[in-house]
Amino acid sequence: MLVTSSEWAAPEARLQRWQADQAGSWKEVGAAIPVTLGSAGMGWGLGLHLEAAGPRKREGDRRSPAGVFSLGDAFGYAATAPAGVRVRYRGADRRDYFVDDVASADYNQWRRIPAPSPNQPGERWGSFERMRRDDDAYELGLVVEHNAACVPGAGSAIFVHVWGAPRAPTLGCTAMSKDDLLTLLRWLDPAAAPVLVQAPRTALPALRLR
């Protein structure tokens, strides 16, 4: 998946699917998908790429991470994955959280408060993301493995998820329509080790894998 924007500060971008054929040549798959980014655009994240010049992603900066990233679990409000989705899926309920408390050992990790423990996340973490929300943003989503080493302050809880409205920016995730996200998830083949490549078009030449 390749997400490109016009500049670092742009909150809108396009996602194009790419797939290698048997000869190793890369081909576009389908039409480009409109997506929204963080309201502050993008900054280099921590992923499979080497460091490069440009703004850096930090906790709470409202930037989506730029770079090359592995993909984690798909998730959603349903108990089981939608038909045709092959990536590992995790159903989220009111006890599921993603921790963005930089002082916690659980930083940048999905955590579940098990029953019968009181469902009081504020007693465990100073800041957290509810994975079962009152809106449809996380009705369907995909974890982006930004900052997999959980470096405090480097950014957390980065997902591909359903947007609140067309062109509505996020707090640092990449969002699109539910229909487009479902198409994307059904296309992903975990056996192919898919990745997310995300950067302003002018920064793509600077991308180098570790």
Regions found by a protein language model. Give the residues of each.
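Cell wall/extracellular polymer interaction/catalysis modules
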Residues: 1-171, 180-210
